[in-house]
């Protein structure tokens, strides 16, 4: 199954995340198919940028967002249906 999920990047105790499409069997920070955006919770205000067209295209093809990504997409106004 293909998932839309967060890939952890950055230094120790200073993480930021890339929003990627990856096979559910690959490791969290491992191989991914495509990068869709990024999320940085350490900045004030929190930085979140995503390509809504790519997200919707992947979801139409059957990709499932993780719970965290789903919450972030809902907050930003990108539809998750």
Curated annotation (Swiss-Prot):
GO cellular component: cytoplasm; small ribosomal subunit
Name under which the protein is recorded: Small ribosomal subunit protein bS16
Keyword flag Ribonucleoprotein: yes
PANTHER family xrefs: 30S RIBOSOMAL PROTEIN S16, SMALL RIBOSOMAL SUBUNIT PROTEIN BS16M
SUPFAM superfamilies hit by this protein: Ribosomal protein S16 (SSF54565)
Source superkingdom: Bacteria
One Pfam match: Ribosomal_S16
An example molecular function term from Gene Ontology annotations: structural constituent of ribosome
Similarity field: Belongs to the bacterial ribosomal protein bS16 family.
Keywords: Ribonucleoprotein, Ribosomal protein
The keyword Cell inner membrane is assigned to this record: no
GO-annotated biological processes: translation
